[in-house]
């Protein structure tokens, strides 16, 4: 076991080193943390040095700018600016070095790490995904899992039915040219079910005497419509908007049918209002209907 642990420890050590900050990075982070805490989160080295061209300043301009600031903030002239001058000098040294300046510009663009003494210094905080993103991710994973499970179940059931049909055909001594009666029992105490092999097709005999074909094609194929991804929105639609749309359609049909019946009734009344033939007597019933007697 010791032989297996050594490579793992080496890899772990390399990974730890890859995530450790260099000395210059630590200096940059520390100075950036100090000036952003004192002057605001938008403060950076270029603004701190009061460079006219900011990030477009050349190395020569950055060095020359420090000489200009030294006339006012050098501690020999004013001791109270000692800490400020140290920061100005360090920022100038970092930006006047091309490789160090690239490092600073990278973190300035992509973000600086946070600082916490209890966590061992500087660290990058992990981005916390939003609630809707987590819910959407879980929703997608659940539906994909449900669809995969339905495919596995479908294939398993289809394979089981195909094997059962194959076993029944092996008992058919007519070679698919006649009819063979079989009895299927799951265990000895089972009453069993009657089966019929008719021209290579297997049927189960129902209690009422009808026959049902046993075929893997009768299984419902996996579909997205059977997943929650489709069923829940469809159910919500049917209970809300779909219900109102359906009832509106029914009302329209009923209204049209009433109009149609009314027209037919009027036409019928016109026919009934015809005069009686010769030899017929007109009689009015209590319900208002008018009839005519035969000749």
Swiss-Prot record:
Residues 152-295 are cytoplasmic. It comes from Saccharomyces cerevisiae (strain ATCC 204508 / S288c) (Baker's yeast). The keyword Transmembrane helix applies. Residues 267-280 have a biased composition (Basic residues). Gene3D superfamilies: DnaJ domain (1.10.287.110). PANTHER family: DNAJ HOMOLOG SUBFAMILY C MEMBER 1. It is found in: Endoplasmic reticulum membrane. It is a single-pass type I membrane protein. Belongs to the DnaJ family. This is ER-localized J domain-containing protein 5. Residues 259-287 are annotated as: Disordered. InterPro entries: DnaJ_domain, DnaJ_domain_CS, DnaJ_domain_protein, J_dom_sf. DnaJ-like chaperone required for the folding capacity of the endoplasmic reticulum. Residues 42-110 form the J domain. One of its GO terms (cellular component) is endoplasmic reticulum. Keywords: Chaperone, Endoplasmic reticulum, Membrane, Signal, Transmembrane, Transmembrane helix.
